[in-house]
């Protein structure tokens, strides 16, 4: 613990024998032993309390994770699945009611109205004119289907045909050059 070797302990014993004297040395050693015992007991008590606190913290963590698993498992029960499906169906039915046209007010309340009421203009049904962003997006989508390499197509130039028949002879000469 203190990294004291046998030779160092012997030196301390000799110095204590000379400084304290042979008469009082056993009482001093007994007192030092008692202090060491008290220090060890306090250290072990502290260590025990610390380990107990760690066990309690681990138990609290285990209980918390167990409760989370229990809550998750209750959501997977058949009745829990059916209730969530029922909620989804109810939401879908509520959305269907949005598409229905608004019913007109009763005839009694419609009679006092005059032509002074201005109806809201109808929204146009024509699509919006194309924007620059639309063309950029279209070009980006077209680029996906194009090949990765840039390929240049070469079209052969038409050869002028002379009246004297020199063009067929030149074509045969090119064929011979390609063959070799």
UniProtKB/Swiss-Prot annotation:
| Transmembrane regions | 1-21
Spell out the InterPro entries in the cross-references. Answer: TatA/B/E (IPR003369), TatB (IPR018448)
Annotated GO MF terms: protein transmembrane transporter activity
Disordered: annotated span: 95-180
Q: What is its main location?
A: membrane
One GO biological process this protein is involved in is:
protein transport by the Tat complex
Name its cellular compartments. Cell inner membrane
- Membrane topology recorded in Swiss-Prot or TrEMBL: Single-pass membrane protein
Q: Name one Pfam family in it.
A: TatA_B_E
Q: Where is the composition biased (Basic and acidic residues)?
A: 170-180
Q: Which residues form the signal peptide?
A: none
Sorted keywords for this record are: Cell inner membrane, Cell membrane, Membrane, Protein transport, Translocation, Transmembrane, Transmembrane helix, Transport
- What residue spans carry the Low complexity bias annotation? 103-123
Of the GO CC terms on this record, one is: TAT protein transport complex
The family line of this record is: Belongs to the TatB family.
Q: What does this protein do?
A: Part of the twin-arginine translocation (Tat) system that transports large folded proteins containing a characteristic twin-arginine motif in their signal peptide across membranes. Together with TatC, TatB is part of a receptor directly interacting with Tat signal peptides. TatB may form an oligomeric binding site that transiently accommodates folded Tat precursor proteins before their translocation.
Quaternary structure, per UniProt, is: The Tat system comprises two distinct complexes: a TatABC complex, containing multiple copies of TatA, TatB and TatC subunits, and a separate TatA complex, containing only TatA subunits. Substrates initially bind to the TatABC complex, which probably triggers association of the separate TatA complex to form the active translocon.
Return the NCBIfam families for the record.
tatB
Q: Which named protein is this?
A: Sec-independent protein translocase protein TatB
From which organism does this entry originate?
Answer: Bradyrhizobium sp. (strain BTAi1 / ATCC BAA-1182)
Q: Which gene encodes it?
A: tatB
């Amino acid at each position: 613990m203190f990294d004291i070797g046998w030779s160092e302990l012997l030196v301390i014993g000799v110095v204590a024998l000379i400084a304290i004297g042979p008469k009082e040395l056993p009482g001093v050693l007994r007192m030092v032993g008692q202090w060491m015992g008290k220090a060890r007991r306090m250290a072990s008590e502290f260590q025990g309390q610390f380990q107990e606190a760690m066990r309690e913290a681990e138990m609290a963590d285990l209980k918390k994770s167990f409760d989370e698993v229990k809550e998750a498992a209750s959501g997977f029960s058949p009745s829990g699945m059916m209730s969530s499906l029922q909620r989804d169906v109810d939401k879908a039915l509520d959305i269907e009611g949005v598409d229905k046209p608004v019913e007109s007010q009763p005839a009694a309340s419609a009679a006092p109205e005059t032509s002074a009421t201005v109806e809201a203009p109808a929204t146009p049904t024509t699509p919006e004119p194309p924007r620059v962003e639309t063309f950029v997006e279209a070009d980006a989508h077209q680029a996906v289907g194009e090949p990765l390499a840039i390929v240049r197509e070469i079209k052969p130039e038409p050869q002028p045909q002379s009246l004297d028949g020199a063009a067929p002879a030149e074509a045969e000469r090119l064929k011979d050059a390609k063959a070799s």
